[in-house]
A protein has these predicted regions:
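Polyanion-binding surface elements
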Residues: 1-25
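Glycine-rich, aromatic-bearing surface loops/beta-hairpins
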Residues: 124-245
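Basic amphipathic alpha-helical segments that dock to polyanions
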Residues: 25-32, 47
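Acidic, glycine-rich loop-and-strand cores that form catalytic or ligand-binding grooves
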Residues: 96-140
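Conserved hydrophobic residue
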Residues: 35-36
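Short, Lys/Arg-rich nucleic-acid/phosphate-binding segment
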Residues: 39-45
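Leucine-rich, amphipathic alpha-helical/linker segments
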Residues: 68-89
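A short, Lys/Arg-enriched interface patch at domain edges and termini
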Residues: 52-75
Length: 245
């Protein structure tokens, strides 16, 4: 099992972030009760896949470090778009497909996620698969890092996980899961019969600027190797930000 400090180093190195910045994200999550606590020595905290998923989300989805805790709390209140639609608009399902977009992709742990699972839950599953050595096998040998694209938006709550595996022309599959707020639709979205309506026009413009960050599979694979105690088996990453070892 890995320590929080080791996780910070891996995330900083694989995302190209300053280690001090990621350390502050981790400290803020600890204070907010969003990261596993522990003591010193043998009782020191050992991070979990969910700890790693929360720290990744904090770093990716926050323009400012001080926003990290709020970012994680927002993404802990998300739901995949198809599941949300099936739950709140059961009479308007034409073209929506199944409520769990992961169901036909072929990874049991993702397919068995409940409808109410969050973006962070899905991210934790991918990290667990990486720690078991199964994610790299799933991605194949053809540009495996590019088999996954993860986008996190701020301050708007929207994240996307895309997976595409191509081995040859007759062996390829893909999935895209979009996560937004799990709140029920606002009242303006339905008329008296329950039919969904377009949003009302506004007289003012919201000046907020949405930002999004994209990453590939590399951070997941390195975090998984760290949790499995196999980080030394992967190529060393060095840069201006930090070094893994």
């Amino acid at each position: 099992m890995a320590t929080p400090g080791e996780l910070v180093k891996v995330i900083a190195a694989t995302l190209g972030e300053d280690e001090a910045t990621v350390t502050q994200h981790d400290r803020n999550l600890l204070i907010a009760g969003l990261r596993t606590k522990g003591g010193r020595g043998r009782s020191a905290a050992k991070v979990t896949a969910h700890d790693a998923a929360r720290l990744l989300t904090s770093v990716l989805g926050s323009h400012r470090v001080r926003d990290g805790v709020d970012t994680v709390r927002r993404y802990l209140q998300t739901q995949e778009h198809h599941a949300h639609w099936h739950q709140h608009h059961p009479d308007e399902l034409r073209g929506m497909g199944k409520p769990n977009v992961w169901e036909d992709y072929g990874i049991p742990e993702l397919a068995s996620l409940p409808r109410e699972h969050t973006f962070i839950d899905a991210l934790a599953v991918l990290i667990t698969l990486a720690s078991e050595g199964r994610l790299i096998k799933e991605l194949g040998d053809f540009h495996p890092f590019e088999g996954i694209k993860i986008i996190v938006t701020s301050p708007r709550t929207h994240a996307r996980i895309s997976m595409h595996v191509f081995r040859h022309k007759d062996d390829h599959k893909s999935v895209q899961a979009d996560y937004g707020s799990n709140e029920p639709p606002s009242e303006w979205m339905k008329d008296k019969t329950g039919k969904v309506l377009p949003p009302p026009t506004r007289a003012t413009v919201n000046p907020r600027l949405d930002r999004w960050v994209e990453m590939n599979a590399m951070p997941l694979l390195y975090i998984g190797a760290l949790l499995a105690g196999k980080i030394d088996e992967l190529p060393k990453i060095e840069g201006e930000c930090t070094s893994l070892r």
